[in-house]
């Protein structure tokens, strides 16, 4: 391991170690499958797969005679056909068989038939948090979506409340502030007046509705109060006699008061608008919205004042008609239907989270009811009205209390839920159809829906992604990603600015820096370093508790909901050894506000300064001195760094390098403490101390030169020697882009910040030849080429070295089976696997047919269908795989075997390759200069790299300068530094180190010109900077074409490297040539070099024969235009100067010749 010096303003030790960085994946999947708990036969009943089976079973037949009951499920580990390594080599999925023990119970006879039923296979997660599907490693990205529960928000003049369930119908309330009416919508259908909805749910009288929402006051009716009563609303109906009936909710007039007095009504109950807060625990409202709705009912049903209440039929007709327009209605059914929509567990499920959110919002303790209750509906309406009146505040939809994370386990649970409900339906059908008493449990269960749903999810879901495997950091970040897109999430086009923006609740939960540039900005984010997902799916972050102004070592994880209104101090607030703050005013944050306060008011304190950013951002030293946009680019570009052959860890690190290497899964860690008894290049054997058994050894297999998903090279190298003692968890072998157990994405280079003859203009980079010679930026890239050998209708294809019409020189590289030999250097066009296919009858000439009929089969010809090296690829063949049906058991139909050839290429750094630092300072190598021509220091040391000083001021990434200064000191003092993010080294500390190393405190030195030996006019800033080579290599982009494929309709060359296309000559280029009057150049570009078919062939012949050429025909695009005009019904023909018709197609030519 490297010894690092801690250099910064904070303490070297952290109060809380970083968690396992991929635990979000591992924990979620373990919760789903519960493998550890299955061993003890005690799975949690309401988690994952167990909960799915418990909810679906028992399945009962329609008549109730037969029931299919569930006992338990188990995973058959011995059914793993292949290990992880074999799955990758053979293109298989790493999965195990899922079996469920079912009891088929005949309730009439009491007989029980038990059987373990096959339920398909289930992909298993590797210990690195990935899945292997069809031979490729994939990651299931966590999705961040709107949490179930209730949300209150305002759009234009509408105040709305939405109750969003986990599964079921959405319920939406809205107040139209212009008209003061409250409506309800179910599943975004037609809106219904709230009072009608309440009546349909059982609040069938006006009195019930009023006493639910309003405080009621009793008032004596006497001469003294007579003047105050008119204009107030009755809360209880008053029935004096037949034609004197006063309804609750009606406004009192002066005449009414007189009637009361005359008829001996001494006391009446009125709506008390002002007393909305008088009763504790009750949330009454103070506006007359509900009363307006009652009034509107009268208008809606044209009631006469005399009639007392709305008949139930009218209410049901109105509500049901809006919900299910055009369906026939029976009142009892309508009532049942309405109840089942919200109150039946089969149709509606708030989920644990939805219930938790509702209880939290309305202050109830109920955490178990999964359906809506009448209280929920009443509370929601009251709360919405109180917001409308200004007594409560709206919700913030982008608050992390209203967004939650669904990880692998939950996504898979939902897939299984959907599949199992189809299985249930099929089972019920089979129970009713067949002779039930002859049935076995396995005959009732159809596995198809499960198998296809799981396959579809892993293979095609938007959240199941091909793992980004460029380097260990890319792998790790991919597993910690949160995606707002995908099924049930947002879509790119509809996501507005607010959803994408940074929110104050992201602090310590989601990284404000790391997100892609482009259309997905803010929709795909990264988990912060200490963040974790709680049982409800909300993101939590740890804090230290502060009690009475004293910091304790007690930790508490808070979700965004818990953190609201809490007073939180920063991690670097100064306090003494007793935990007392040193200053009287400490800077804190409360919700979204930043302020200072007395230590007594503080509730919590941050755990670490790097708590609020992600792993990638935490790898950037001096991050706080960079502009946020550049920090974003720096975080994203570290993920694109190619693993090098000889990387070095950075001199200036942040302390995160070893954590990333350890958790990424690319290094080998010792499982138990022990002594190394064998260490070869591909195997380590450790004898554990704890075990007495001589045969109990830990074996570790070292991966050598394997291809990753992105064609980079995965190679591990051993770090231990035989006889060495190792501790548990110690790193015993490095992986790609790691050195001595630390992440090493690039190399440290001696830098001069100086323009050099215009070669580093506009972010270009000038580099010394030493870097290429010493292979500092050489990387290995491995490509896979595969070919299938099929059974065709004319006979099988054959792999053979006997290929027609191929030169001996090319065939020499193949072995006796017609496969390229391992170790051969191949170039474009070389054959990797010789394969011949039987020719179809149509390909055969008449002469050949005659021979076949005379000599039988012998003369049948074959066609060369070999696998060749594509353009732009060369390298050494390092491996050949042959996969046959015997190996795998099932290849796709018609395929006899698959051959894969792996070609590796060493790529040195060259002009056109993209390089970058860790601060978003990216550029393209413009020139590689001989060492002797590079500027050099006073002691003769030539620079490795020259960057343009103009790249710094406008970009505001000063971190690169501070890193270079400290790096220079570190190089000459032979030290490596840990400079933690947000508490990095001060200028004084850096200058101290520079002086110690014998440099100017400004790190500006006199440089000499390599050409002349003269010193440059001004001193130049010199430093040591950490540079990476990115996965944008010039070899992958460079492309040339002479002749190649043409588009079918327009007959113009295709575009793009993948199609081996040509260079586009667009209208602007044509204008430029026209402006120069280059008529002949233009003519040949637009005809023979593009789409004049006959001209192309002729000119090629003439060039081959060496004849001067001047060919011009009709370009195909003209023919296309002609045919399009004919398609419009215009009869067009072309004639030459002599009046002869020019044929456009072969058919026309025949017609003209005939006539």
From Swiss-Prot:
Origin species: Borreliella afzelii (strain PKo)
CDD domains per the UniProt record, alphabetical: RNA_pol_B_RPB2
Key words, A-Z: DNA-directed RNA polymerase, Nucleotidyltransferase, Transcription, Transferase
A Gene Ontology cellular-component term: DNA-directed RNA polymerase complex
GO-annotated molecular function: DNA binding; DNA-directed RNA polymerase activity; ribonucleoside binding
Subunit structure: The RNAP catalytic core consists of 2 alpha, 1 beta, 1 beta' and 1 omega subunit. When a sigma factor is associated with the core the holoenzyme is formed, which can initiate transcription.
Name under which the protein is recorded: DNA-directed RNA polymerase subunit beta
PROSITE patterns: RNA_POL_BETA (PS01166)
Protein's job: DNA-dependent RNA polymerase catalyzes the transcription of DNA into RNA using the four ribonucleoside triphosphates as substrates.
Record family assignment: Belongs to the RNA polymerase beta chain family.
BP term (GO), one: DNA-templated transcription
One Pfam family matching this protein: RNA_pol_Rpb2_3
Reactions catalysed: RNA(n) + a ribonucleoside 5'-triphosphate = RNA(n+1) + diphosphate
Keyword field contains Glycosyltransferase: no
EC number: 2.7.7.6
